[in-house]
């Protein structure tokens, strides 16, 4: 089940040694792919260890990434802070992670992807164990920001590591296992802490969740095979920056970067403050309100159908259908009735995953010679949207309530629809 954090086509995909035209810079080592050992094949013990190791890397990292989202109402009550301030515990992580993804991807070309994955997962979850000791909001936000910095190595390099080490014929299966780990990890990071609130405070709930994330990291370290096909490359930051600059001058890519920023920001904003609505307006206990994150399961259907729709009717049509579902879902989510509101949330969830599945794949297709940089920039904008809009939406919710929050998010979605339409028209003109 892909979640907003973990579509396989949105991750920088620099894998095995590539030529200069693919990276925008000459390789530091002329070793050819033919001189490297064959990629791991399904049925080999090392293949299964690799797939399981990346499964646990996803479980650990995406658990840690969103571990405070379901705890935000509890943080507001315990610390006497506003929802916008509580949202900083999510925005700090995703914002710093967004800024660190591209440097981490480039650095991994020199230091090795496996080492970076191990360090990132272990260090981030160890820091997570210290978060319950934070004396106040300031230190908690600092700790969450540090977690975001450390976590960046996993989404920036995990899929590239798989593409590097696994035989191409068996790669989709391994990728699917990793994506499943991301999805389940993200759900655990939301459901487990909220469920524990019925029996304990936020500190205990967070400590238990981070203890589990650390256990996932340790398992990953123990079973991760040694890299066999890694070839270090010289760092060419200027060349990378020139490539990224060219991508922003392409209106189709720039539009898709904006689509990722807006729709991810809207999606995270809705779920950041949905718990407050369920608890304060409808009287649900925190443990029951946390079950709303199960609506993420709509992402399974949406991502698959979005891909099929893009293949059958075109990416432009598919992305606009997803955006339309968001436009329909938000007014329904504003209704003051629980059983009417939840289908609206489900519709927006479905629409978001459709948009994300199509946009992330479209970015790679538009930049075949610099796919890694384009996918990395999409991820950067995607997580920045989560951070910036997730925080700003907290001020709207605190000042004007749920209905105004839905209007604000609807306005953002309409801007996203405009960008998506511009991308679709531009793509049609180029095709013609």
Q: Language-model features: where?
A:
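Juxtamembrane intracellular "pre-TM" segments in multi-pass secondary transporters
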Residues: 35-45, 225-257
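Helix-breaking motifs and short loop linkers at transmembrane-helix boundaries and internal kinks
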Residues: 80, 112, 133-139, 335-336
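Conserved MFS/SLC helix-loop-helix module at the cytosolic interface between two early adjacent transmembrane helices
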Residues: 99-135
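Helix-to-loop junctions at the C-terminal end of transmembrane segments
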Residues: 101-112, 301-314, 397
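Paired small-residue
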Residues: 127, 138-147, 339-347
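Helix-loop-helix hairpin linking two adjacent transmembrane segments in secondary transporters
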Residues: 139, 168, 177-224
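Cytoplasmic helix-loop-helix junction between adjacent transmembrane helices
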Residues: 143-182
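C-terminal transmembrane helical hairpin of 12-TM major facilitator-type secondary transporters
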Residues: 316-359
């Amino acid at each position: 089940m892909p979640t907003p954090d973990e579509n396989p086509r949105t991750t920088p995909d620099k894998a095995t040694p590539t030529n200069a035209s693919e990276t925008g810079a000459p390789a530091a080592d002329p070793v050819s792919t033919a001189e490297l050992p064959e990629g791991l094949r399904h049925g080999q013990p090392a293949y299964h260890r690799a797939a399981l190791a990346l499964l646990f890397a996803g479980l650990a990292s995406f658990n840690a990434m969103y571990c405070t989202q379901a705890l935000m109402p509890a943080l507001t009550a315990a610390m006497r802070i506003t929802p916008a301030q509580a949202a900083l515990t999510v925005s700090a992580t995703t914002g710093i992670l967004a800024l660190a993804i591209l440097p981490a991807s480039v650095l991994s070309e020199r230091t090795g992807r496996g080492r970076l994955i191990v360090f990132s997962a272990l260090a981030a979850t160890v820091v997570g164990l210290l978060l319950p000791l934070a004396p106040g909001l300031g230190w908690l936000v600092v700790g969450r920001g540090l977690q975001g910095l450390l976590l960046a190595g996993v989404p920036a390099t995990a899929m590239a590591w798989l593409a590097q080490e696994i035989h191409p014929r068996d790669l989709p299966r391994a990728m699917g296992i990793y994506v499943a780990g991301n999805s389940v990890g993200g759900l655990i990071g939301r459901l487990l802490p909220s469920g524990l609130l019925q029996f304990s405070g936020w500190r205990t709930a967070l400590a238990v969740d981070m203890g589990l994330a650390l256990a996932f990291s340790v398992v990953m370290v123990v079973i991760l095979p040694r890299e066999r096909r890694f070839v270090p490359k010289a760092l060419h930051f200027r060349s990378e920056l020139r490539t990224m600059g060219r991508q922003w001058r392409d209106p189709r890519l720039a539009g898709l970067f904006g689509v990722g920023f807006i729709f991810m920001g809207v999606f995270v904003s809705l779920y950041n403050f949905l718990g407050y609505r369920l608890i304060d307006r409808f009287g649900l206990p925190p443990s029951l309100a946390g079950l709303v994150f199960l609506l993420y399961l709509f992402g399974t259907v949406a991502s698959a159908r979005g891909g099929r729709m893009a293949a059958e009717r075109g990416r432009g049509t598919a992305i606009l259908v997803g955006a339309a579902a968001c436009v329909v879902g938000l007014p329904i989510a504003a209704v003051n009735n629980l059983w009417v509101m939840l289908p609206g949330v489900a519709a927006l969830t479905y629409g978001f995953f459709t948009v994300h599945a199509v946009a992330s794949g479209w970015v790679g297709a538009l930049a075949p010679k610099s796919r890694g940089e384009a996918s990395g920039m999409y991820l950067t904008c995607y997580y920045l949207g989560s951070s910036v809009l997730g925080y700003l939406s907290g001020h709207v919710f605190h000042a004007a309530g749920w209905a105004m929050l839905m209007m604000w998010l609807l306005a953002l979605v309409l801007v996203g629809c405009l960008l998506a339409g511009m991308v679709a028209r531009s793509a049609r003109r180029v095709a013609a």
